[in-house]
Amino acid sequence: MIQALRGMKDIFSPESERFVYIIDTASKIARRYGYRYIETPLLEETALFKRSVGESSDIVGKEMYQFIDKGGHDVCLRPEGTAGAVRAFIQNKMDRKGGVHRFYYHGPMFRYERPQKGRLREFHQFGCESFGLESVYEDFTIILMIKDIFDTLGIDYTIKINSLGCPECMPDYKESLITHLNDIRDGLCEDCQRRTETNPIRVLDCKVQECQAMLQNSPVIVENLCKACDSDFKRLQSLLTSHSIKYELDSKLVRGLDYYTKTAFEFVSGEVGAQNAIAGGGRYDRLVEFLGGKPTPAIGFALGIERIMELVKLPESEREGIYLGVMEEEAIDKILKIAHRKRATERVYVEYSKRSLKAHLKAADRVGARFCAVIGEDELKNSQIWLKDLQTKEERRVGIEEF
């Protein structure tokens, strides 16, 4: 028997109901914040992610589904959504139009990594990208939007924030960090020793406990910010505090992608296993220019749908729609016509098989229909339909035309 590949799964009800509910809820809130839906390809040039995510990142170095296609092009399945959104933004010349552009998207991403709780090789993200505003108020609004999404979904979380500085203050910090890392190099894991040479900031993000212990006295980014970055970060904290939004400062929060600058944030939950981030993002003011576009400030985030599915409780749904059934085969044509007419405004379930009234009532209850409508021998003779409201338990017969 052929089975789904490791780390990839099918989604059936009731899981699929939660899946759709999460996307619908996040989409509705994003639209309220002025975001418009976009769709980008699953397949992109590998160079896009090497340039944006960074060749030294784990995603590019270890995790991409990468291959040469029949045309000889080096392509890969997208491992994340921001790079494709930025590529689309530039390709469609939106960087030349000026103004503010806000987009949201959702869909599958692919990373070849070890499957574990809340982490699959094919996983789904909901993301938002805002282009054109270099403002701490936009940073705050993005965090507020994610908060609204999780509050609506009934998910508990902790907000963590950090600043990654800018081209003015990051070089000096990186130099002092490298000096410190070289001093403790022998106590670091192999990955961190490699990152010390290729991408020292990522060492701070290592999950190995021994490395974290060695990093206790490492230089702190927010203590090395330039005047502008320091002012913005303090303003962000002030906004969060004034709106009674609790947060934690996390000097080790650097995110896993190379394109982030200034504000970085994560929403974390202790209920999703070792990989406890359920949403994350930050500012990437240089990425549009780096990928060939006109310099454009930007900020974005993504939340992992599989990560939060177990945390979401669906609201209790009322019965909905009409179940149509027959007790005589001659009535099938009539219920097909009724179903076609009713589907203009109602959800309709049709059972084509001849069944007893008791069997139809059980089936209507099973699909959650509000009404069970059945045509039997007597109803057929009198051009009527038997109708039961499964919520109020009221029963009656009505004319087919009237119904």
PLM segments and residue spans:
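TRNA-recognition modules of translation machinery and tRNA-sensing kinases, especially anticodon-binding
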Residues: 1-402
